[in-house]
Structure formats: structure tokens, C-alpha cells
Amino acid sequence: MPESLPNELHSAVSLGILLLASLVGGIAADVVRIPKVTAYLLAGMLVGPSVLHAINHEHIQNFEPFTKLAMALVLLELGCRFPLARLRPILKRALWLGVGEMSATFALVTLAIWLFSGNPAMAVLLGALALATAPATTVLVLKESRSEGPVTELASVLVALNNIVAIVSFELLFLVARMLSDETVVSFWSQLGRLTADLGGACLLGMCGGLFIGYFSGLLNRRRWLVMVLAVAILMLGLCETWHLPYMLSFLIAGVMLVNTSESAPDLLSEQEKIAGLLVVVFFAVHGAELQLSAFLTAGLLGGVYITARSAGKLLGANWAARARGEPANVRRYLGNCLLAQAGAAIALATLAAERWPGLGDQLQTIILGSVVFFEIIGPVLIRQSVLQAGEVPLAHAITHNTVT
């Protein structure tokens, strides 16, 4: 019998355990009325290395292609929420609110970390990382809640803005921090040129992908759309990995391009949903299994400072900006809660920092991994409660949410 067979089989068993745990978690979520996203995360954590050790870390890494594909499809759907006719009237509001929320978050996190660590480079980089909001978590909780209204609409736009600004600002600040340290190995302008090329390439790839999907949806029979969307998504993911492009930006742009160039976008999304639902379960179960309770403790004082300062920045910044702009009371009270969840983008950037700058990057990674345990468990609950209290969840859905199916 081949030696690789037991490992391959065990990976499949691990996936089965994750899915069964998620099934039980989803049923429990209906009973206790918590978002299914939280249930899948907790189910993954329970069977993962942090608690029961039913799944080891090596097998979790084998599922990375599934989780990236799930994130890609979620971002494609998020981009499809922004047809220009709908985006124009809300963009001015969202930009003002985004500037207020992100400025407050960056300032509070940077100042707090600087005071407690005395390390300005760590402070500004954590300030940039604090801007990122988990797109998959936020979008899927809003989708599960079937919420509609100003809080939901603004949260969707701000999630996209937060992640774009977080990626760009982190790369720029990381570059400046390295330049000011004694470890400078490349020129500022060459690195800036590389960053510009990466961002431009990601946007161009996303535009091409969105146009391709939209054009060929008009030529192909509907029953072939799912294969076509998956083929393009996987191809785009592969190209992003090959060329080291930020794939989240590519798929967001692809969605925006698709919804503004093709009348088939809503039907394409409904076809995509046939497999996206399963991939989303895998995504959150795997990320739950990756959550390390020990990292939460290892993050220590700086982790607690980061969590407190980021939470205050998101909540107070959104509230102050909404007040200054004269937004409705519901937006002032609840928008900040919808921006607290944090996972994929922040983890990816912190991992990149650890690879490029082992000393400081390792500290950033420890703090982010520890804080993600808090934000990914608390975030979805706050999002659902916020849209519910804002009156944006249909009454019938709010009443029947705890029905076991």
C-alpha cells in the first residue's frame, strides 16, 4: 500500500469532521439565535488543534485552495453590489464616513501601541492593519440576516474601502519603516514602483475577469455558467499567486466590472450560490480550526491594547463621522459595530510582514493572530444584533431565525 495513502485519506477525514461539526454548529445556531458564521468558527475551533486536536495543522493547510476560492467568490459577490447607478449616491456618504472611521482607528491604535511598546514602526504598521475588516464575515452575516437599509448599504461599501486602504497603506508604511531602519536593502522608488505595478495588475486582471464572465454568460447556456465562473475564478487565483498580486482586490474589481457590464450578473450570482454555500462553510470551519486560543494569551498586553484601541477607533470614528454628516440615528449607533470583524486580510498582511522582516513581523503576527480570535467570534454577533436593532432585518426572518431546519 502506498505510503502517501494514509495521509491523503486522513486529510479527507479531517474535511469530513469539519463539515459534520459545522452541520451541528449550524443547527445549534438556529436554536440559540447566533449567526451561522460564528457557529462554523466555533465548530472549527472545537475540533481543531486548539481544543480537541481532531484535526492537525498540516491538514488544515491542505484546505487553503478551498478557502481562497470561497473568499474570491464572496468578494466577487461584494463587487456585484456596486452598480454605478447605486454607487454614485452612496459613495460620497461612504467616503466621508470612511475617512472618519479609518482616521480614528489608525490614530488610536498607533498612539496606544506606541505608548505601550515604545516602537513607532510597530505602532504605525498595527495602525494600518487595524483598518482591515473581514469581508467574508461581514458580507455573509448581512446576507444571512437578509438585511436592507442604510446601515447594511454603508457597511458593504466601507468593508471594501477599508480593505483597499489597509492593503495600500500597510505596504507604503512597511516600506517607509524599512527605509528608516538599518535593514534597508532596496530603494524606496523601486519598491514603490513594484507596489504600484502589483495594485495596477490586480485591477487590470479583475477588469478582464469581470468582462470575460459577463461576455461569455451571453454566449453560453445557463447550465454551463457555474463551470465558467469557477474556471475564471480559479484561473484568476492562480495568476494572482504566480504574479504575487492582491487577489482580494482583483475579485472585488471583477464584481464591480461584471455588474456594470452585464445584465446577467444577478443570475450568475444565483448559479454561483450552488457551490459558494458549501465553500463558505469550509472557509469558516477551516478558519475556526486555525484560530489559536494560545495566541490570544501570547498576544498579552499589546494584544489587549490593540483590541481595545481598534474597537474604540471603529465605534467612535464611525459615530463621530456620522454625526458630523448628519446621518440618521441608526447609522450613528450601529455602523461601527458592523466593521469590527477582522480576519483574512489582516492575517495575510501580518504573515507577509513576518516573511519580509522576521523580527518585527513576528511580533505583528502574534498580536494579529491573538486579536483575530476575539474579533472573529464577537464580530458576527455584533453585526447581526446591529442590523436587527436598526430595523433592517425583515420581521418574518427575525422571528423564524431560530427555527431548526
Where would I find each of the regions flagged by the language model?
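Transmembrane alpha-helices that form the ion-translocation and gating core
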Residues: 28-31, 88-147, 211-212, 297-390
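Membrane-interface helix termini and inter-helical loops of multi-pass transporters
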Residues: 2-6, 53-62, 179-196, 291-302, ...
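Alpha-helical transmembrane segments and their lipid-water interface positions
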Residues: 37-43, 52, 68-75, 105-109, ...
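Membrane-interface alpha-helices at helix entry/exit sites of multi-pass transporters
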Residues: 147-168, 185-189, 266-270, 330-336, ...
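Membrane-interface junctions of multi-pass transporters
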Residues: 28-35, 46-93, 217-225, 232-306, ...
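Hydrophobic alpha-helical transmembrane segments in multi-pass integral membrane proteins
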Residues: 54, 107-114, 166-175, 236-248, ...
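Structural signature of hydrophobic alpha-helical transmembrane segments
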Residues: 3-18, 59-76, 119-134, 194-205, ...
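Intrinsically disordered, low-complexity non-transmembrane regions of multi-pass membrane transporters
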Residues: 1-9, 154, 183-190, 219-223, ...
